[in-house]
Amino acid sequence: HLYFNDLRKFGWIKVLDEDGLEQEVSKLGPEIEWPEFTFEYFVKALHSKARTKVKTVLMEQSLIAGIGNIYSDETLFKAKVLPTRLVKDLSEGELRSIYDSISPVLELAIEHGGTSLKDYRRLDGGQGDYLHFANVYHRASQPCKVCKTTIERTVVNGRSAHFCPNCQR
């Protein structure tokens, strides 16, 4: 049996031979645990899209594989950077903070089985409970867990972006 549950309608299934698979994988940037995902690579990748909002660049799979909407919001919250900032306006310290925030956010998400929205399930049928640990994602109009300021939601490149206007600059 093959089951494909694509709640958000972003997924696809392709049947590929080895060459086709290699072509598809070659379109992806490195995953964060790969040795080539260094701070230097990260800065170069982001600067290649300098006039783009940082949230959009973090979700660009050809630059960095594996960061989607939820984890870009959470990474930027941890780094204290607004999702609407242009890459060209970020300091080296802010870039370092974003880079250093990616792994802990994704590790926590993996530890909690990811995020289950509506009817999404893991392969074992269970639900991921990361959303209970999220600081900003899906928390618009609720108080920030850090400062109690109301979490806001905006749209960045067609995707929702959640942030704390006090904690993030």
Residue ranges and their predicted role:
Residues 94-111:
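Basic, amphipathic alpha-helical segments enriched in Lys/Arg and hydrophobic/aromatic residues
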Residues 80-89, 95:
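RNA substrate-recognition surfaces in RNA-acting enzymes
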Residues 144-147, 164-167:
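Short cysteine-rich clusters marking metal-coordination/redox-active sites
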Residues 61, 138-141, 161:
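Residues immediately within or flanking Cys/His clusters that coordinate Zn2+
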Residues 102-104, 121-132, 145-149:
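Short Cys/His-rich Zn2+-coordinating modules
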Residues 72, 151-152:
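Short functional micro-motifs and their immediate structural scaffolds
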Residues 1-66, 71-78, 86:
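Phosphate/anion-contacting hairpin/loop surfaces
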